Amino acid sequence: MEEEQQQQQQQQQAQKMQGTEQSAQLPPSAPGALPALVTGLQGTEANALQHKIKNSICKSIQSKVDCILQEVEKFTDLEKLFLYLKLPSGPSNVEKSDQNSLSSSRAQQTHAFSWIRNTLEEHPETSLPKQEVYDEYKSYCDNLGYHPLSAADFGKIMKNVFPNMKARRLGTRGKSKYCYSGLRKKAFVHMPSLPNLDFNTSGDGLDGIEVSTLLQSADEEVVSAACRLVCEWAQKVLSQPFDSVLDLARFLVKSHYIGTKSMAALTVMAGDSAGLKGITQTSAFVPMSESNSFHPQVRNLTSQVDAKQQLQRKIQKKQQEQKLQSPLPGELQVKKQDGTASNGITNICNGSPAILSPQPIGIVVAAVQSPIPVQRNRPLVTSPSPIGSSEGKVLPLNVQVVTQHMQSVKPKTPQNIPASPVGDRSARHRYPQILPKPASSNALTIRSPTTVVFTSSPIKTVVPTPHVSSLNVVKMTTISLAPSSAGTTVKQTSNNSTSATDETRTGPQIKNGSVVSLQSPVPRVGTPVASSVEVKTEPEIVSEDTAVRCQKSPDSSKVQKRTLMSFTHKGNQESVTSKLSHDATRDQAVKSIDHRAEGTRTKCKSRSVEGINVSSTGSNQSTLTLCVAPRTLFNNRSSQNTNGDQGVKDVRMCTKSPRKRLPTTGQESPIPPAKKSLLGQLPSECPAPEGIAIKKIPKTLSAKNDDAVTLALVPSKETEGNNTTLAANYSLSCVAEAPSDTPQELVASSQDVNLKLEGNVFKFVNESKSDNPFSQDAWQQIAEDADFPSSNCEQTQTIGVLDMSGTSGADNLQKPVWDTVDFEGIQQDTYSQQLEDSSLNQLQAHSSNQLPQRSDMTDPSFFSFDDDLTQDSIVEELVLMEEQMSMNNNPQNYGNLGMVLQNQSTASHGTPVPTHPGSAHFYHSVHSSVTPVHTPTPTPTPTPTLTPTPTSEMMCGTQSLSRESPCSRLAQTTPVDSALGSSRHTPVGTPHSNCSSSVPPSPVECRNPFAFTPISASISYDASIVSSSPVKPMQRPMATHPDKTKLEWMNNGYSSVVNPSISSHGILQSYKELDSFRKPHAFAVPGQSYQSQSRHHDNHFGRLTPVSPVQHQLSIINNASKQEGFAVPAPLDNKSTNSSGNSNFRCRSVSPAVHRQRNLSGNTNCPVSNVPQSNMTAFGTLVAPEIQSILNNIQPDSANSIAQRSQSVPLTVMMQTAFPSLQKQSNTQNITHVLLSKLDSDRDDAVRGLGINNLPSNYTARMNLTQILETSPMFSGASQQNILNSSSSSYEFQTPSYLTKNNSSEQISFTPGENQAQADDIGEQQLDFSSTVKDLLDGDSLQTNQQLVVQVASELNNASDFSSDIRLSSELSGSINDLNTLDPNLLFDPGRQPGQDEDATLEELNNDPLFQQICNESINSMTSSGFEWMESKDHPTVEMLG
């Protein structure tokens, strides 16, 4: 490019000069007329050449050249000559390289395109390494002096040339390369066509002759491509689809757009009468068959007679050929563009290539002749292709898709569907069958024949089914096809169609999630297509026998019974109107999904549950569970084009495979009357197991309170690949709230409920203002239900469900009762057993017993596990490992709790509910006695991690134990990658592996969330707490070995100190927000905040009054001792659950129960020996392992359980480590909140054992890390934060610099220079804490902390100082009481002046009564010096501090 540009400049200037030189020879007018004439060229050719060159140069350069020319015109001849001689020659300078690098010119693209076309060809058996291809292209460009395209641009051109090519990574581990699969170098290379440089031909003939010669030389591909372009353009201009240039020409002639008397027009018309009809009927895509090439040339063809005739001949020939052979796979795109299948049938397959490939389905597409003649070539289903005109006609689409039994078809097969053109009004129906290709792993296997009949237009479909098999959902949704492209309006013909789709695991969705149901392409915007479908499901004799039993065979995808839903047109009661607003169209095609089906789904959720009988009572209004959430065929569809309906499939319905994207559900579709309320509400006693591996606690979907069925629509935003379809996985859980009420009642009350999806928030609008507006309880339940960790949703999206009172209108939020539901595609389902017991559920519906049953949420479908993991196996592991682990429940519950916390981006954008849309909101259930403390963190750091740090944590007092704020439970495991920004779901265990992303989850863990990860997981990430599962015999906590422990303390203590310092020092929120802090964790920090909430049964914790985190933790510790006795491996080494875990201390003698502390992740409290909370003193904490554990607990957010393992550690050892003083955090939350939140996390334990002591849920591998990481948004950085900081809390205080030995080998010193002693270890830490802390301190003007840090660092550097001055006598290590009595000098460096560290910030804090109280109560609230005011407090710790 640069060269061309310069050459042009030179050329033009040179030509200028030459023109002047020629002036003598030429007539005086010549130079003026052709200033840029090149000698030897005729005027026309010179102009042509100049014009060509000019077009290849960007505008800016053209303007520059013009300016230069203006200057040059003023020169004398000599000056011009001089300029000409001075023009630089040779390769152009790099001056313009920057401009070129920014954007590739069309010339470069053309070169690349031609090189690719001439060098490579498709070959299914071979692959070419991408780098080699690019290198070859680059060398080609270098040889010719072209500027090569950037690798990214080149890749785009490759995709254009070979749309079917896929990228693959081939090679052995560590040596794999990315390859273009399906390509090879051409075996036979054609001589490249060279541009015609012969400009000496006579100018007169230039027009006609040149075009014809160009056409003759142009290769057929180019011609067909040009035809396609012309047709495409004509379609836009004329709003009429044209299959070929012939059609266009004929149309132009018939419509009198052009003269009909010309030779060309006559020829066209003669050809038309001669038998072109057959041609037109050839596939709609015929010209498109070669669609892959793009060439803008030949635009003028239509106007050229010769061109037209030639094209006619060629096209006719081609069309006839193509009649014989169905279009090649590559042609799909073309088809799409051209006209989409005339019947629209092919369109099923035809959306975009992406759509095509993903779901293989054996489909027989029968185009049923629609009663109304459809105009020929009118695509009934308009694919998103540009063709669709804006007309909003709805064509009746009568398509019967019959899936062949057990045929698995590769995704590409759809491409092979011959288009059945309806042709000119003679609807010729072909019944091409897509032949199944060999099943591939992708291939969808349809267990039982699925028949999807799509009928369009208000259709009342009745599917009487005497028995309900496993639900076969017939999705009766009218698909309004807006064949926008054709101007002709077609009457809507309603066809009744019923489809019983075998749902492989998810009813209608075929395993791949491609629902047989055709996705009606979203009508084009501007096409008002609203077809209402009234579907009545009349459970005909749905006998309980026929209870929908979703058997989930280990291969959940494989066995699914088929339930036929009988739909009767009952009145509007069930009618689902799916309206597609144009706007909505994109979001959702017909949304009317039988939400009732969803309701049943709620029941059905369990369906995937093994062997769970969802008995639909025989006569219940039996809206049997219509799982009418057909998956849209195109999982990939990037836009929510597909009918929301199809998308709506119950999340559970969704294929289990986490990979699949649930089709987006119509977000706006009102939920059809709740009639779908689970017909056979499961009797309360009837367990509707979550469908999750948790067999143990199937939750009964019994409706607990309200008649109203609550539909929880939980959209989970799943971004998979590029498609960010908000797959709203709505699991509409219709929970019949009145257990005894008949479903009808439920239906009646909920019928009018509209679920509106605004932004990410669903608003439930009770239109009917039914007698029972959904009670908040019901809503809470819904929220619980709604919280489906949809494994499919990779991106956890918080969806705030707003309960809008019907009367108040959608905008009225009845209450923030809704916990915003966080959907993390959490595999939690597997874990989550409904914690019926768990207080969380209670929390969720405190007053309302209502749904412990959110259980359904854990639907196998949500399992991120692939089918090979069976629920059974998972269940067994889970049950065996920790059936009681509340953890399982926690994740779900937190969802119930609306633990939106995790979601940073609350889906609540559109909804009034989220007060802080930016931050996940945690709404405590209104009923919970605990007052939720909603502290939005200033801003959840938007990190790739799915779980935004929940900014608000609910800190609950003792009640929190019972109700545990969801936060505690929330520690939901986030997808493993979340910290990395990948929301990809990993096997249930993995996402929650407690290891920070840096620590590879143990192989076991992947399968078993509770599995133990190797204790040796990386030490550097203390956050990576590997021991996620109960201790296994082989993994005795290293801490149990006294000598080893001591050594490790000595060796590692400092290394962990830095992180601990981070954790012990709350990382300032600004830091917390830093990616560096967050990223190390694979899991969102939200869990951490939970950790920080240690559950305190203690009364003082129960009160919301600020509780010193230390005391808090002490109580936690006490609780921990209470906690389940089964031994939990103490997080060894740096593995403490605290993500800052580097400072985790091993407790040698701590009982397993103590170790069980859940890695702090759950409790974040080291269950240290029970230490009287009051006894805990900051110094005591430093000194006593118990205290340290307390600190750890306090820091659970920071996940720096410094003391965690330290209980058994001798005081001397502990004393040797300096506890970095906590840095002041500008947390908005009160410490109390933080602590409470931590307590709540403890509550997970409660869930587990139903006792506060049950930390197991936290303890589970996933929980450990996830809680630590996820618990507190503050902690989200996985930065170790002060325990207090862990939850973002308003309180600020400096933690005393504790002398504790942290496992991490680093010293606590924050100053970058000062950790030198242990500086080497720092490298392991997630952050170089010294610099980070320093920045934090500076940034937050925490000079005091900084000073403290410096002092601490200096002290740490001089470890000897600590050992001599601060070391406690080993005698003291025995009990905290002793510690309380210790001489303060032992704990603190006597040399240090109490006032030294105090700073303006401290003074501010001192002025804050709450802060003071907190400081008083929390050991770590103050540095030894620094809070003199605390001396007035009666705590011995305070005294010691003083």
Curated annotation (Swiss-Prot):
One of its GO terms (molecular function) is RNA polymerase II core promoter sequence-specific DNA binding. SUPFAM superfamilies: Winged helix' DNA-binding domain. InterPro entries: DNA-bd_RFX, RFX-like, WH-like_DNA-bd_sf, WH_DNA-bd_sf. Residues 957-995 have a biased composition (Polar residues). GO terms for cellular component: nucleus. Keywords: DNA-binding, Nucleus. Gene3D superfamilies: 6.10.140.1290, Winged helix-like DNA-binding domain superfamily/Winged helix DNA-binding domain. Pfam families: RFX5_N, RFX_DNA_binding. Residues 1-36, 406-426, 485-514, 929-1001 are annotated as: Disordered. PROSITE patterns: RFX_DBD (PS51526). Residues 112-187 bind DNA. Residues 935-947 have a biased composition (Pro residues). Disruption phenotype: Morpholino-mediated knockdown in embryos results in a defect of ciliogenesis in the neural tube and failure of neural tube closure. At stage 18 (late neurula), neural folds fail to close. At stage 23 (early tailbud), lack of acetylated alpha-tubulin and ARL13B positive cilia. Reduced expression of TTC25 in cilia axonemes. It is found in: Nucleus. A motif (PxLPxI/L motif) lies at residues 192-197. Belongs to the RFX family. Transcription factor. Acts as a transcriptional activator by binding to promoter regions of target genes. Plays a role in natural killer (NK) cell maintenance and immunity. Plays a role in the process of ciliogenesis in the neural tube and neural tube closure by regulating the expression of RFX4. PANTHER family: DNA-BINDING PROTEIN RFX7 (PTHR12619:SF2), RFX TRANSCRIPTION FACTOR FAMILY (PTHR12619). This is DNA-binding protein RFX7. It comes from Xenopus laevis (African clawed frog).
